[in-house]
């Protein structure tokens, strides 16, 4: 005796009472003959990979549902109760459907970024004890000197003695043209005693810049004290 092959379509037909109950829970009604027609003849023409013996693959059921719910003339509103019942059997399977439900594939891993090639380590440039030669630029101008170079040595006014100066007075000659003793330049002849006494009375003595003199005080006409350059005893 040969064994019959169980398919998703034959499995639903063998548990038709459960299929009607699940459809009722979705608020729809299904008929057995139209169930077979849509599963084996209509949905395979949607070109989404639906097999004639039916499937519990959730991705294929979702693709057929999109075709059925398409708006306009491309939709199939008469097939809505049947694809909704197939979806309920796959997403909330009863015990007799679980062995045929395809396990949900794991989510695809995100594409990993291509690994970049490792950069070779930077080699340390060899050190050299030689320094580059500094060449003067052609367009560089010489810096002006603060003091002009006169060829003579500079004198440090703080640490060195000043140079000797030439005496402006001419050297005295031994004798004048008359054969007598020449009087040194800048020296006046000695005055006579009588002239010195008369000059002392007429001219006031020259005040020395290094000494100070005190003059007597006299009361003026307005009652203020004034300095008098001489006293009555000097007369």
From Swiss-Prot:
Keywords (alphabetical) are: Capsid protein, Host-virus interaction, Lipoprotein, Myristate, Viral budding, Viral budding via the host ESCRT complexes, Viral release from host cell, Virion
**PTM:** Specific enzymatic cleavages in vivo yield mature proteins.
Record's signal peptide:
none
Is Phosphoprotein given among the entry's keywords?
no
Q: What are the start and end residues of every segment in region (Disordered)? A: 108-235
PPPY motif, short sequence motif: residues: 162-165
* Disulfide-bond pairs as recorded: none
GO CC, sorted alphabetically, is: viral capsid
**SUPFAM superfamilies (alphabetical):** Retroviral matrix proteins (SSF47836)
The source's superkingdom equals: Viruses
What's the domain remark here?
A: Late-budding domains (L domains) are short sequence motifs essential for viral particle budding. They recruit proteins of the host ESCRT machinery (Endosomal Sorting Complex Required for Transport) or ESCRT-associated proteins. Gag-p12 contains one L domain: a PPXY motif which potentially interacts with the WW domain 3 of NEDD4 E3 ubiquitin ligase (Potential).
This protein is called Gag polyprotein
């Amino acid at each position: 005796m040969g064994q019959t092959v169980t398919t998703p379509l034959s499995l639903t037909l063998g548990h038709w009472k459960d299929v009607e109950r699940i459809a009722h829970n979705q608020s729809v009604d299904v008929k057995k003959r139209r169930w077979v027609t849509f599963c084996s003849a209509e949905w395979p023409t949607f070109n989404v990979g639906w097999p004639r013996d039916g499937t519990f693959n959730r991705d294929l059921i979702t693709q057929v549902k999109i075709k059925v719910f398409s708006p306009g003339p491309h939709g199939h509103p008469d097939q809505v109760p049947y694809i909704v019942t197939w979806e309920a059997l796959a997403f909330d399977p009863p015990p007799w459907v679980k062995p045929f439900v395809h396990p949900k594939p794991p989510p695809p891993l995100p594409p990993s970024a291509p690994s970049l090639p490792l950069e070779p380590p930077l080699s340390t440039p060899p050190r050299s004890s030689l320094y580059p030669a500094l060449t003067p630029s052609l367009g560089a101008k010489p810096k002006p000197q603060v003091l002009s170079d006169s060829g003579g040595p500079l004198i440090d006014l703080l640490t060195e003695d000043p140079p000797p100066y030439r005496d402006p007075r001419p050297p005295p000659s031994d004798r004048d043209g008359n054969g007598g003793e020449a009087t040194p330049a800048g020296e006046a002849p000695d005055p006579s005693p009588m002239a010195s006494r008369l000059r002392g009375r007429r001219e006031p003595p020259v005040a020395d810049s290094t000494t100070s003199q005190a003059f007597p005080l006299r009361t003026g006409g307005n009652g203020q004290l004034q300095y008098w350059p001489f006293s009555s005893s000097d007369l």
